[in-house]
Amino acid sequence: IMPSKACTISGSTSLINFAYINEDSYLTRLQMLAPLTFKNITLQVWQIAANGHALTFDEGVTVVSKYTSGGNDIAGIRNIWGGTDSSSDVASSDITIKSGQFGWICGGSGSTGAVIGTAKITMSGGTVNGSIFGGGYEGACGNTEVVMSGGTTCWIYGGGEKGNVTGTSKLTISNTAAITENIFGGSDSGTCGNTEVNVSGGTFAYGIYGGCFTGQVTGFSKVIVTGGNFSGTIYGGGFGKKCGQGDSRDANLGKVGKTEVHVSGLTNGEVSVFGGGLYADVTGNTQVTINTGKYNHIYGSGYVESPYNPAHIGGDVTVTFNDGET
């Protein structure tokens, strides 16, 4: 049983080992009862449900326990939920990561329980081998906020996995953050009210999407990019689903209400900018503003690969080119 008062579990060096096991000596899920900080310690932990309590991985945390993914054994805490792993709701959640290794992190809950207020994740170090979700695996959140200034992750979402965000999901990326896959302001398959993505630094391999993967943004998606080591593509909208000839296209996948994209300071000439989505529609207006920099292509519309993937825009398309070149 974990402490019922705020606690720091630390060692004089990271060689000190903390293992959370059940009566049969198997690694088991840690249920938090109060705010908890790990520092200068080696961990053997399977999963953590923070239950709405502040969870911090301070400097000097190393995780040696392993989980299986894709047939491989990977060192890290497999799952962390800022909310609950049940149908119980919490007022808010707060996860801070400065070191350590992890599989999947959700600011929200692992089951149907909601985070009524804001679910927040702050990452300045450490490694996430899977994905970061500001929201829940299933449960809804009022708002979400993900701030990443360092460390490494594969995918990162401002919103949830299946879980909805009824208000606004915010994603801020800066400094030395490294993302090896795509960036989404919204959810994977859940919905969001609005999304905001602000990128001022970091290193990126693929795309920045203001919207969701296949989930919907019912209001607006706003993307502001002012820096970063990046050679991919910026989309104001969502990803959607690629269709081939004869496929039935679901126009709701990745759909966004309206978009704004503001870009400046990217100078390598390799980045393309779209006001809309990749394979996803925008029902209202799109607006792209270029302030400075050098770019590959700039479109106020969505990406149009073929007649089977039109990425429709339902409203007006506006491109404002204040300065820069293509």
Segments predicted by a language model, with ranges:
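Glycine-centered low-complexity coil/loop motifs and glycine-rich tracts
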Residues: 44-46, 80-89, 104-116, 131-141, ...
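Generic detector of ordered, mature protein regions
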Residues: 20-22, 43, 51, 169, ...
